[in-house]
Amino acid sequence: MASAASASASAVVTPSSFRCVPTASCGLGARGKAPAPRRLLHDHAQGKKRAAATWSLKAGLWDSLRSGFLKSNNSTETVEPPSAPIEEEEPLPEELVLLERTLADGSTEQIIFSSAGDVNVYDLQALCDKVGWPRRPLTKIAASLRNSYLVATLHSVTTPSKAEGEERKQLIGMARATSDHAFNATIWDVLVDPSYQGQGLGKALMEKVIRTLLQRDISNITLFADNKVVDFYKNLGFEADPQGIKGMFWYPRF
């Protein structure tokens, strides 16, 4: 499920929500509720409290680009910025158990989604090697993570059946997004360990990323998709070249 600069798509989506099992460090505990069943935790409820919404890309994108001006009676009025800078609240990280299962040796494996952005660059490089991505300088990988608006991860955490065994934690998936923190976000570097593909984890990761961006009031969501994964993103609600809008690229020619 790697994302590459091949074909562009823009999202007008409202992702399905998840029923989640909060971890101890999450701080989003479901008080008094029994643990969720050991399966991929999709919520198939009808969502009565939240009406489905779609965003018009033409209105949303272009309105955001011209949002510094108001037109009234054929005159243009400049919108004055606030007198004091508005401090942006730091979004609280989210950590959820998406899947829990017992392995053949009796150990327990949990697949944990996190938006805390805690990624070891060496673990990420190893994951990129597994999916066949070309290696990039570690300093640039670290900079890309540091400068991202959102970094979401999937970790496999295995707890042995015997108390004396050590817990094992492995990075198995990641996606990140850059943003102007107001209107637009672009999703990059979506990847899942090949040994964990085909289990719905890539879809779960993307839906959580989209939902997190929507919760932060980011409604114009774009990405670049390799031809092999265009259908995957279309099934999530992304649209290629909406209303004739084309992605354009500039490359150095030296």
UniProtKB/Swiss-Prot annotation:
Role description: Catalyzes the N-acetylation of serotonin into N-acetylserotonin, the penultimate step in the synthesis of melatonin. Catalyzes in vitro the N-acetylation of tryptamine to produce N-acetyltryptamine, 5-methoxytryptamine to produce melatonin and tyramine to produce N-acetyltyramine. Acetyltransferase required for geminivirus infection and systemic spread.
Annotated SUPFAM superfamilies: Acyl-CoA N-acyltransferases (Nat)
Enzyme Commission number(s): 2.3.1.87, 2.3.1.-
InterPro entries on file: Acyl_CoA_acyltransferase, GNAT_dom, NSI-like
The keyword Transit peptide appears for this protein: yes
Native source species: Oryza sativa subsp. indica (Rice)
A biological process term (GO) from this entry: seed oilbody biogenesis
Pathway: Aromatic compound metabolism; melatonin biosynthesis; melatonin from serotonin: step 1/2
Domain N-acetyltransferase: 119-254
Alphabetically ordered keywords of this record: Acyltransferase, Chloroplast, Melatonin biosynthesis, Nucleus, Plastid, Transferase, Transit peptide
Catalytic activity: a 2-arylethylamine + acetyl-CoA = an N-acetyl-2-arylethylamine + CoA + H(+)
GO CC annotation terms, alphabetical: chloroplast; nucleus
Lineage start: Eukaryota, Viridiplantae, Streptophyta, Embryophyta, Tracheophyta
Name the record gives this protein: Serotonin N-acetyltransferase 1, chloroplastic
Annotated Pfam families: Acetyltransf_1
CDD domains: NAT_SF
